[in-house]
Every structure is written in structure tokens, then in C-alpha cells.
Regions:
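Amphipathic alpha-helical interaction segments
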Residues: 45, 116, 120, 124, ...
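C-terminal peripheral helix-coil segments that are non-catalytic and often amphipathic
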Residues: 1-30, 124-127, 131, 161-177, ...
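Amphipathic alpha-helical segments used for helix-helix packing
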Residues: 117, 131-154, 204-211
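Helix-turn-helix
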Residues: 45, 53-87, 91-92
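All-alpha amphipathic helical-bundle segments outside canonical DNA-binding/catalytic cores
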Residues: 116, 152-159, 176-192
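Amphipathic alpha-helical linker/stalk segments
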Residues: 92-121, 151, 158
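Generic hydrophobic, amphipathic alpha-helix propensity
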Residues: 42-50, 67, 92-96, 100, ...
Length: 238
């Protein structure tokens, strides 16, 4: 039965999940510019276009044939790489989290004083979410699915371990230096940072309509960014 075959993408991710080095995704435009037999390039192009499709229309509304047309591939090729529409959707979710964690790992937080490291982490999270609206929208879609597809992922928890480990180290250094207060949970700190940065994007349109403020204006965004940083730092500070 075709559904029993392990998709190419799943095999590759299972083989590489423990690897610290992952090539950055190539832009879809690059994937279209040169027709090659490079699976990495082909999958990167499919994932980029599929992210927009799923973010715009959700899992039920997204069309594989539209993704195939936009990437100049075929439905058959997409199914070969990802197994099914649901498999592609899960791959897009995993890839979105993986890319965020990859960039996050380059922040060199361990080289900064604890409070500076915390500020940098909050700033990064805010900036990432503000410039990756499709990521926010697909996470919203998955929550509307009650996390059903992420629950099927074999790698999602491991992908996010480094994020919590970084906060654990940062927090431990802050405790040792006497600048952070005791009794805080690193996962809770992570949740607070994520929630504040996430809301700024997920609710920007409804918030703007209700309060008649353009939250996307550079000045408004800079003010909100500074406010969120201060909220988190003051919460953790001793």
C-alpha cells in the first residue's frame, strides 16, 4: 500500500535530526531558476511555497496542485517527497520550527552577561515573529487543529530542546550572578516570551481595528518591542 511507504522527507529528517549542521532553505525563486535533480533544492522550494499556501488557506483549503504549479514540480513528486498532503503540512510545521531554532542558535547567548542575553533573546523572538507572519499563521492553524499533526511528529520535541536549554543556561548564570530571582521555570519564561511576541502579530489586525492604531508602523513596533523586552527582564530580574 502506497501510504505505508516512508516519505523521502521523513527518512531524511529522521537521519539528520541529531545533526547540528543543517543547510539553510533555498528560496523558492532559486529553486525555480535552475532545474536540477537536487532533492534539497526541490524540497526547499516546495516547503517555502507550501508554507504560504497552508498559512493562507489552512490544511483543508490548501491545494497540492497549486503548490505543484507554483514550484513547477508535479503532484507525484510532492507525494514522493512528503507522502501526502498531511505529510507535507507536518513537514512545513517542522521546517518552520527548525529554521527558527537554527537562527536562534546563532545568537551566542552564552557569551553575553545574563540580562543582556535575555534582552537579546526577547528581541530576536519579537523580530522573528514580526518578519515571519506565515509562521504565526500556520501555528494558529495547527492550534485550530488542536495540535493533532504536531502530535504525530517524531522530531518536534527534540527540535525545541535547544531553545529551553539556552534559557536554562541563561537563567542559571543569572542566578549565580545574583541578578535573577529564584523559583522561575525556564519553560514558563519561554512561554511568556513567545506569547508576547506572538500576540503582536496574530492579533495585529483585530487590535488595530478596535483601538484604531497601526501596530505595524515602525514607531509603534519599536515601542512595543521595547515594552516587551522590559516586561520580561523586569519579571526575571531580582
Amino acid at each position: 500500500m502506497e501510504g505505508a511507504r516512508i516519505p523521502f522527507y521523513t527518512q531524511k529528517m529522521n537521519d539528520s535530526v541529531h545533526s547540528k549542521r543543517r543547510p539553510a532553505a533555498k528560496p523558492a525563486s532559486s529553486a525555480l531558476a535552475k532545474r536540477t535533480n537536487d532533492p534539497e533544492r526541490t524540497m526547499a522550494g516546495i516547503l517555502e511555497v507550501a508554507l504560504r499556501e497552508f498559512a493562507d488557506k489552512g490544511l483543508s483549503g490548501a491545494r497540492i496542485d497549486e503548490i505543484a504549479a507554483a514550484t513547477r514540480t508535479s503532484k507525484r513528486m510532492i507525494y514522493y517527497y512528503f507522502g501526502s498532503k498531511e505529510g507535507l503540512y507536518l513537514a512545513v510545521l517542522e521546517h518552520s520550527y527548525r529554521e527558527m531554532r537554527r537562527i536562534e542558535s546563532e545568537l551566542t547567548l552564552d557569551n553575553l552577561p545574563p540580562e543582556d542575553a535575555l534582552r537579546r533573546l526577547v528581541e530576536f523572538t519579537f523580530d522573528h515573529h514580526a518578519t515571519h507572519e506565515d509562521y504565526i499563521r500556520i501555528v494558529i492553524n495547527e492550534n485550530m487543529e488542536r495540535g493533532k499533526y504536531l502530535a504525530q511528529s517524531q522530531i518536534i520535541q527534540e527540535l525545541n530542546v535547544p531553545a529551553i536549554s539556552a534559557i536554562e543556561r541563561l537563567y542559571a548564570r543569572g542566578l549565580a550572578a545574583g541578578v535573577f530571582r529564584e523559583g522561575l521555570d525556564p519553560v514558563d519564561i519561554h512561554a511568556s516570551i513567545s506569547a508576547l511576541a506572538f500576540f503582536n502579530v496574530s492579533n495585529q489586525h483585530s487590535f488595530g481595528q478596535i483601538f484604531k492604531r497601526d501596530t505595524t508602523a515602525p514607531a509603534a513596533r519599536a515601542l512595543r518591542r521595547a515594552s516587551i523586552v522590559e516586561m520580561v527582564v523586569r519579571y526575571v530580574r531580582r
